[in-house]
Amino acid sequence: MFLPFTAALALLFASGSALHDDPLTQPIPGNPDWMKPQSPLKLYGDTYFVGTGGISMVLIDTGDGLILIDAALPQTVAMTEASIRQLGFRVEDIRYILNTEAHYDHSGGLAALARESGAEVITSSIGAAALRAGRADAHDPQASSLPEQPPVPDARGIADGHVVRLGDTAVTAVFTPGHTPGSVSWTWKACEGEACVDVVFASSLNAVASGSFAYTAHPEVTAALRASIDRVEALPCDLLISAHPDNSGGDVKIAALQAGATPNPFLDRSACRAYAERARGRLQARLDREAS
């Protein structure tokens, strides 16, 4: 029998001084929802949600080790580890950590989790360069406001379409730049017996910028984001996890799944299309504001 999630967290934080002294888990200020505890849960087959209330993270049990997607913030690493252990898995069995984007709310915890697990961190080449530097790419629309984060010296860059294979699982990189220059979405199949579904962990597709950056002044970024939105919309998609759950109704689905809802609320073949349509609308609204 496993401890309730809140009890597991309490035990983990009992030695809080060590956490505060760790340079790789020093807090970076952010949206309070990003730090809100969220009990882990099975999404489908061997795919599990281990994120926070506002940031998605997924654990895949491949049968020959674990794959983790994204790492949230430095200060949420302890929560992530508690979630993984609450599900009955070992952090030390994580072989790969895949990243959607080099923004601190999705990659700030990478350095600590890679150290604790010994896992290899994988993302796009542009994203990997940003992770190794510990700062956002200079061409990122939010570069002027993003804080530095713990560098990931050994982050490995891969090409679009690269397949990460482990055990009986193959996870494919789908480059989706725009929100950041190096954004990556990830796809794989999850199975329950003979019933397999196409899973998409979609990167953020929001047209967000800071400082003097304007999408109207950077048509190449706008075009890249439009193409990424179209690409996510066209993916085989039975189950969607968006980088921030509330961007796709994932927060509502998590609550429903935890309450025992049937059928599984995450099984929705229209989810990627709806996510893309929302992102497309936000981009157009941004362009209209900038042009007015």
Show the residue positions of the predicted features.
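Sec-dependent signal peptide recognition
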Residues: 1-8
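Accessory terminal helices/loops
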Residues: 16-33, 193, 207-292
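Metallo-beta-lactamase
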Residues: 20-29, 36-38, 42-44, 93, ...
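Conserved beta-strand hairpin/beta-sheet module of binuclear metal-dependent hydrolase folds
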Residues: 33-87, 91, 186-207
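Loop/turn elements at helix/coil->beta-strand transitions in domains of secreted/extracellular proteins
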Residues: 65, 92-95, 117-120, 169-171, ...
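Active-site neighborhood of phospho(di)ester-bond hydrolases with catalytic His/Asp-centered motifs
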Residues: 69-71, 94-103, 122-124, 176-178, ...
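Active-site HxH/HxHxD metal-binding segment of metal-dependent hydrolases
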Residues: 75-78, 85-163, 191, 267-268
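Active-site environment of divalent metal-dependent phosphoester hydrolases
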Residues: 76, 102-108, 128-131, 181-184, ...
